[in-house]
């Protein structure tokens, strides 16, 4: 998290840049950075993050953030790609798409992430569910299905109202 009130994220970023220069790490990225935060990092250090891990799921698809990432060569990684709770998994639109493809709603959502170009790493302790989550490469969502899922996004879609513009992790 950028923790904007503390204002030390550029210093922390510089430490990561140094660690990369010293060969301690190969790639550096951030989590929950908005375009303004990213612009500041890039302007002050000249180094663009490789990845930005952001909240991304059908109820909060972050279209503008993803456009920024694409324009700057930043990989989008989705945290909470399946959202939380059963609301998204029981959504009628997603269930209909899943039924058409003979897949689970989770597989539909993970395929949606893949087709958006986002990296999703769903959490699961179940080996069977982990295998299911990887079985998303034998089908594709069509343009209309992608539009339907994108249309589920809503302004109040954040899981815990953790807005990176004001949220403080510590």
Q: Which residue ranges define each predicted feature?
A:
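Beta/alpha (TIM)-barrel catalytic core signal, keyed to glycine-rich beta->alpha loops juxtaposed to Asp/Glu
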Residues: 3-170
């Amino acid at each position: 998290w950028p923790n904007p009130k503390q204002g030390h994220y550029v210093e922390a970023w510089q430490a990561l840049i140094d660690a990369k220069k010293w060969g301690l790490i190969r790639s550096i990225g951030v989590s929950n950075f908005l375009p303004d935060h990213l612009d500041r990092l890039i302007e002050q250090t000249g180094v663009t993050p490789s990845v930005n891990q952001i909240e991304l799921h059908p109820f909060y698809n972050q279209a503008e953030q993803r456009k920024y990432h694409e324009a700057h060569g930043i990989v989008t990684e989705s945290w909470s790609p399946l959202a939380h709770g059963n609301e998204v998994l029981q959504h009628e639109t997603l269930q209909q798409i899943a039924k058409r493809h003979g897949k689970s709603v989770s597989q539909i959502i993970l395929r949606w992430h893949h087709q958006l170009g986002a990296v999703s790493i769903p959490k699961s302790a179940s080996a069977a569910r982990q295998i299911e989550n990887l079985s998303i490469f034998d089908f594709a969502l069509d343009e209309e299905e992608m539009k339907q899922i994108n249309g589920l996004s809503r302004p109040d879609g954040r899981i815990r109202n953790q807005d990176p513009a004001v949220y403080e992790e510590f």
